[in-house]
Amino acid sequence: MFYPDPFDVIIIGGGHAGTEAAMAAARMGQQTLLLTHNIDTLGQMSCNPAIGGIGKGHLVKEVDALGGLMAKAIDQAGIQFRILNASKGPAVRATRAQADRVLYRQAVRTALENQPNLMIFQQAVEDLIVENDRVVGAVTQMGLKFRAKAVVLTVGTFLDGKIHIGLDNYSSGRAGDPPSIPLSRRLRELPLRVSRLKTGTPPRIDARTIDFSVLAQQHGDNPMPVFSFMGNASQHPQQVPCYITHTNEKTHDVIRNNLDRSPMYAGVIEGIGPRYCPSIEDKVMRFADRNQHQIFLEPEGLTSNEIYPNGISTSLPFDVQMQIVRSMQGMENAKIVRPGYAIEYDFFDPRDLKPTLESKFIQGLFFAGQINGTTGYEEAAAQGLLAGLNAARLSADKEGWAPARSQAYLGVLVDDLCTLGTKEPYRMFTSRAEYRLMLREDNADLRLTEMGRELGLVDDERWARFNEKLENIERERQRLKSTWVTPSAESAGEVNAHLTAPLSREASGEDLLRRPEMTYAQLTSLTPFAPGLDDAQAAEQVEIQVKYEGYIARQQDEIEKQLRNENTLLPATLDYRQVSGLSNEVIAKLNDHKPVSIGQASRISGVTPAAISILLVWLKKQGMLRRSA
C-alpha cells in the first residue's frame, strides 16, 4: 500500500549523513521523511567516540555555519575539548572533542524530533520506486510505499555489510544491526558503478580492568573550546581525561605470529581499508622499523565503563585480540567487552554524481556519506547537509548548489569525489585544500552563513548573531585604524614594553597588531587601545584579519585568477569527439567523466592545460561559452 501523504524529500538512513540531510531539507520548508531501521540509533557513533580533528573540525564548523546539527550536538555531549595544532597558524588549527555516545545520540534525536516539517518512521527500506530514470519513492520491508520528489541514500556500511573477526564472517550492517541486503541488490540493478570498501574498529575495554595509575593522562584545554558558532562552554557536560599507553615488541610479535589468521592478509577481505586509519596489523607490517605505537584510551561516556583504545583497530581473532590488549602497559588484566572487527560494504563510484550529490543517471536520487567512498562522521555530515539541501531545492524546482573549492572544505571534498573518485576510504585533511589560508575553522561562518541564509538553512537567531559579529569586527577594525600613538606620547613607554623594537614613528592600533610580538589581548590592555571586544569570536577575527592581511590578499588574487575559467560550464550532452585537436585519451576521459565545468575538467587526471585551452577556444567559437553564477 501507499502511505496516504506524499513527501517532498525522503532520507534513507539515520546516521551522521542522514540526520544532517533530514534537518537541512526540513529547515528549508520541504516535507521530509526520515526512514531508519531503528529510531533508537539515530546519530549513533558506530566507531570512535569523537568529533573533529585536522580537516574534520573544519567540516564541522562549515556544517554549523550552514545551520547544521553536528557542532551543536557535540557541544552538549563533549567530555573533553582540545585545539589541535594550537601553536601553528590559524589555517591548520582544529577543534576536537571526545564524546559521550549516549549524550550525543540524545542531542541528535531531540533536535530531529523537534524539527518542523520532519517525520521519522522506523522501517528498513528494501526497494526504490524508479520510473523513467527518475526516483519517485521508496518501499519498506513490510511493503509500505512512500512517494517523494527526491530521495537521499545515506545507508553507511549497511549495504550487503559483512563483519570479519579472524577467518569467521557474517552479514551485518554494524555490530548488533542487520545488513541491508535487498536494497543492495536493487541498487546493483541500476546503472551505477558499485565496488567494495572496508573499515574497522578496535575492541572495547572494561575500564574497571585497566590500571590507569601507571598511564599518562591527557586533559582537555582550559578555557574549553566550543564547536558551534552559537554555542558556549557552559553547555559542555563534565570533562574527563584520556589516557595514553603504547604497543611494544611483545604486541608486535603477537600480531606477526598470527597474520595467517587475519582476514586481510589471508585474502578473505577484498575491500580496501582507510589509508589514514590503518588496522594495528597494517601499522606493524607497514612500519616495521617502529618498536611502539601510541594508543589513546578514550572514555565512551560519563555513565559507561567502556574504553575505546584508539589505535588498535583490528580484525584478528578474539583470542589474538586478548593477547594484543594484555601485552600493553596498564592493560595486563584488561577485559574486552566488545570484540574489534572489520566490516566490508558496498560503495558507489562518486564520479557518477553531480557536485550537488545527485546521480547523473537517476534523476532525484542523491547519495551521501560512506556509500560515496568517504570515511568519518564529519565527512558524512557535510555530504548529508549538501545532499539534503539539494534534494529540497530539486523538490521545489530550484537549481542545485555546491560550494567551490575556494569557498569551503565541503567544496574540496565534493570536487575531489566527483572529479577524481576514490579507490580507498577518503578522509579530509587541510593539505587537500589549495586555499587553506582562506578556509579556516574560525571564518567558516564568514564564508558560508550568508549563503546558508539565502538557501533557507539559517534561522533568524543565527542570522542576527552573525550580523552582530560582522558589525563588531568592522567597528573594531575602524577603531584600531583610527587610534594612533606617537613615540613622544605619554603612553609610548607602556606600548614599547610590549615591542621588540620601540616606536620610531606614529603607529595605529592595526600597525601595532601586525607586529608578530603583539596580540590583540595585549594591544587592548594598553591605555590608548582599551577596552577590547567582549565578543571573543569577533576579537579573534580582528586579530587574524590584521596579522594575515597581506597573505590573505595574495591568496584572494590567486583565487580570482583561477576562477576566471573555473566556472565556465560544459554542456552535459557535449560529445568531446566533436572538439578537434583533443587527443583520443582526453576525449575518452572527458566523455567518461562528463565534467560540469572547465574547473572540474582541468582536475581530471590526464586532461592537460593545453587540452583545456583547446576546449575554451572551441566553446567560444560555438557560442557556448557561459559561466555559472
From Swiss-Prot:
Keywords: Cytoplasm, FAD, Flavoprotein, NAD, tRNA processing
Transmembrane segments: none
Annotated NAD(+) binding sites: 273-287
Pfam families in the record: GIDA, GIDA_C_1st, SAM_GIDA_C
Protein name per UniProt: tRNA uridine 5-carboxymethylaminomethyl modification enzyme MnmG
InterPro entries: FAD/NAD-bd_sf, GIDA_C_N, MnmG, MnmG-rel, MnmG-rel_CS, MnmG_C, MnmG_C_subdom, MnmG_C_subdom_sf
GO terms assigned for molecular function: flavin adenine dinucleotide binding
Record-listed FAD binding positions: G13, G14, G15, H16, A17, G18, V125, S180, Q370
Lineage, highest ranks first: Bacteria, Pseudomonadati, Pseudomonadota, Gammaproteobacteria, Enterobacterales
Family: Belongs to the MnmG family.
One BP annotation, GO: tRNA wobble uridine modification
Broad class of the protein's primary localization: cytoplasm
Subunit structure: Homodimer. Heterotetramer of two MnmE and two MnmG subunits.
Function: NAD-binding protein involved in the addition of a carboxymethylaminomethyl (cmnm) group at the wobble position (U34) of certain tRNAs, forming tRNA-cmnm(5)s(2)U34.
Cell compartments where the protein resides: Cytoplasm
GO CC terms in record: cytosol
